[in-house]
């Protein structure tokens, strides 16, 4: 790795966590990851749930975001799924779950695990953050899908 800082020889000393390091770490963990926008964003699918791995514009905050882009009409589904997201956020610290309406009028649900990397992360911390982002993202999306199934009378796929 050709970087403008010293990379420690141990796994516990923090050092800058940039996009390339995150992608390399995810791949070293045995996961496939496709770069969507060089230096900014990558995508993967874990347990049939799409994820976006990205940094904010300043390169400080790492986001590991799980997505459920349902085909549910936002107008009818949003109250139930907003309440579900609110319940999750009250009971769990991570990830933050929220809903958004697509341009087509369907409802999307997002579970965003954010890590402040300003002071750097050790290799151990980075692996833990990635693992936590993936596992809690999967749990959050599954929670919302199960709740939607009950509240809206959907099948297991989360579709009407």
Which stretches of residues belong to each language-model region?
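A generic structural signal for beta-strand entry/edge sites
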Residues: 39-41, 59-63, 104-108
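Short, internal acidic amphipathic alpha-helical interface segments
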Residues: 68-112
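Charge-rich, low-complexity N-terminal segments
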Residues: 1-57
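A short acidic-to-branched-hydrophobic micro-motif
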Residues: 53-72
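Glycine-rich, aromatic-bearing surface loops/beta-hairpins
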Residues: 132-139, 153-154
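A short acidic/glycine-rich loop-to-helix N-cap element
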Residues: 117-130
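Glycine-rich and polybasic anion-binding loops at the starts of cofactor/ligand-binding domains
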Residues: 111, 139-144, 150
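Short, highly charged C-terminal tails/helix-capping segments
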Residues: 145-160
């Amino acid at each position: 790795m050709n970087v403008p800082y010293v990379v420690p020889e141990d796994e516990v000393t923090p050092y800058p966590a940039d996009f390339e390091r995150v992608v390399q770490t995810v791949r070293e963990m045995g996961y496939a990851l496709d770069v969507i926008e060089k230096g900014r964003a990558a995508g993967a699918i874990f347990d049939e749930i799409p994820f976006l791995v990205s940094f904010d514009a300043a390169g400080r905050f790492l986001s590991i975001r799980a997505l459920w882009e349902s085909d549910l009409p936002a107008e009818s589904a949003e109250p139930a799924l907003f309440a579900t997201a609110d319940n999750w956020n009250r009971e769990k610290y991570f990830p933050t779950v929220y809903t958004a309406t697509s341009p087509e009028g369907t409802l999307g649900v997002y579970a965003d695990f954010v890590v402040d990397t300003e002071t750097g992360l050790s290799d151990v911390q980075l692996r833990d953050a990635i693992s936590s982002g993936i596992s809690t993202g999967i749990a959050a999306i599954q929670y919302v899908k199960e709740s939607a199934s009950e509240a809206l009378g959907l099948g297991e796929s989360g579709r009407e």
